[in-house]
Amino acid sequence: MKKLFIILVSLLVTASVYSQTYEVNKFYPELGGYVIKTDGTNGVVVAMQDQGAANWYDTEAMVNDASKHDANGAKFNDWRLPTIDELKLVYLLKQSIGGFIDTIYWSSSWDAYGAVWNLQFGGNGNLPDNESPINVFNVRAVRAF
């Protein structure tokens, strides 16, 4: 009976350790960035710094280059461009996240005509636009957790 009790307590402690919950609009170093959406346990974080500027075709290598992330983000290799909907969430939280410049940021979303959706982070220009993938715009990576 004592053995069963110890096993049950161990399972309870283990479950509580692994049931970390996360909130939107908060930085979590262990996730590598700032939470932009979550269901409490799973979600998406955005990197804490831009990865640079590039044409769309060069962004995949850029987002997974550890040297282009802060120390927390460099621990992960599953970074990607945000979808246009995720990029809109990043825009809404840009003041809290910080480090953005007034420029255009790439998304991973394509339109039906071969252009890529992007978002202007400067001024009031927060409406999505679509551009040729050969243009050079800024990159801010996201990753799922």
For each of these PLM feature ranges, what is it?
Residues 19-79, 107, 114-122, 133, ...:
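Extracellular adhesion/carbohydrate-recognition regions
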Residues 10, 68-72, 96:
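Secondary-structure boundary motif
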Residues 1, 83:
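NAD-dependent ADP-ribosyltransferases
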Residues 84-145:
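C-terminal, surface-exposed recognition/capping segments
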